Amino acid sequence: MSFTVAIIGRPNVGKSTLFNRLVGKKLALVDDTPGVTRDRRPGDAKLVDLKFRIIDTAGLEESSPDSLQGRMWAQTEAAIDEADLSLFVVDAKAGLTPADQTLAEMLRRRGKPVVVVANKSEARGSEGGFYDAFTLGLGEPCPISAEHGQGMLDLRDAIVAALGEERAFPPAEDVAETNVDIRPVAGEGTEDEEVEPAYDETKPLRVAIVGRPNAGKSTLINRFLGEDRLLTGPEAGITRDSISVEWDWRGRTIKMFDTAGMRRKAKVQEKLEKLSVADALRAIRFAETVVIVFDATIPFEKQDLQIVDLVLREGRAAVLAFNKWDLVENWQALLVDLREKTERLLPQARGIRAVPISGHTGYGLDRLMQAIIETDKVWNRRISTARLNRWLESQQVQHPPPAVSGRRLKLKYMTQVKARPPGFMISCTRPEAVPESYTRYLINGLRNDFDLPGVPIRVHFRASENPFESKARKRR
């Protein structure tokens, strides 16, 4: 990206709507409730012939530095300092407020290029607010409607004028373009029945951080990044949007998604919280590995178990992180207790990796990252057809399929049809009659014999073809 733009403004002027318009996706939550956005959200924007990095920020109101609003202000100031240009969004329909004047003064002190964006200019009676924006002393305002996409060409011209042609259109680098699929399926399409493809350790890894409110998810990500990138504090439910951040771990790009705390469905009443939870679910589906953060001082609440079950039903690789380990006194006894409860309460994820950590002190973070990588390897694993059929034969010798209605089931052939998560197809007689207990027996055997701990395993059955049936039809 050639340059970076920060979107600045008081609450509810349409900053996130403009952000979504420029990135071409609904990445940021949008609602009539003021203060929806709290963290900095980056994205890749395109405006006519301009391509740039854009940062959505929290709506700013003056408050004490220690308050939540004060910490949000500090995050927005960091975005302004990082950016080459600020889009200062005002509400042309509602007109200017003292908060707009305060923000204008702050931007003037920064001394960086600013474009005043008079949003909602399509509304009746917005002319007064548009002309008032001249009094901010930051140049001619650009009238737009972020919701309807009006005025985007004028906004493009205003950005180029503020930055200058050279900064807006830097010379193209002489680098060959490469089309890279960010979601390759390891080993998909491999024909050799004995070949098991190697794990690709170069591709970026997408990791979602989920858990109950106030489990320490944002603190954990800040510790990974080594900076206060995300808002944290004692208040529950600070995070609303799913915010993505990128960093490098031992030469590999990690893209982490911070998500809103997930409460029990019965407690989620407000529309905004429902939107936040839906955003967290999208992050889970987009991720490859999901870290479920537990509060080690009150682990295995019912909601914790429901979140783990949700992640596994979505087919994601899962890792448990027992956070706030620095607050635990008798940690040896707790560790034994957690291991026992993990095996007993999560039978559907037998062998799942669980790591004690502290987002506050940094304890256990290297072990957590190693667990994430190892779990992702398992999630991507493919097993050759030849090995699977030798294994299937041995399983039937040890524990033959049951007889149903006086006829014994026959499992004839097995292959892995997908990875991410591992999925297998078994050809057999009467697939609809295979008992659930025998399916669990096969899944447990696959998990133990092929070292597939902590990931969902899918086993499906299909009817095996009778080679004589088609010949009989022809004779008729």
Curated annotation (Swiss-Prot):
UniProt binding sites for GTP 2: 211-218, 258-262, 323-326
Alphabetic keyword roster: GTP-binding, Nucleotide-binding, Plasmid, Repeat, Ribosome biogenesis
Sequence positions that bind GTP 1: 9-16, 56-60, 119-122
Superkingdom of origin: Bacteria
Keyword rRNA processing among UniProt keywords: no
InterPro entries for this protein: G_ENGA, GTP-bd, GTPase_Der, KH_dom-like, KH_dom-like_a/b, P-loop_NTPase, Small_GTP-bd
Sequence ranges assigned to domain KH-like in this UniProt record: 381-465
GO MF assignments: GTP binding
Domain EngA-type G as annotated: residue spans: 3-167, 205-380
GO biological process, one term: ribosome biogenesis
Record flagged with keyword Coiled coil: no
Pfam families to which the protein is assigned, alphabetical: KH_dom-like, MMR_HSR1
Subunit details: Associates with the 50S ribosomal subunit.
Family from the record: Belongs to the TRAFAC class TrmE-Era-EngA-EngB-Septin-like GTPase superfamily. EngA (Der) GTPase family.
PANTHER family reported in the protein's UniProt record: GTPASE DER
General function of this protein: GTPase that plays an essential role in the late steps of ribosome biogenesis.
Protein name: GTPase Der
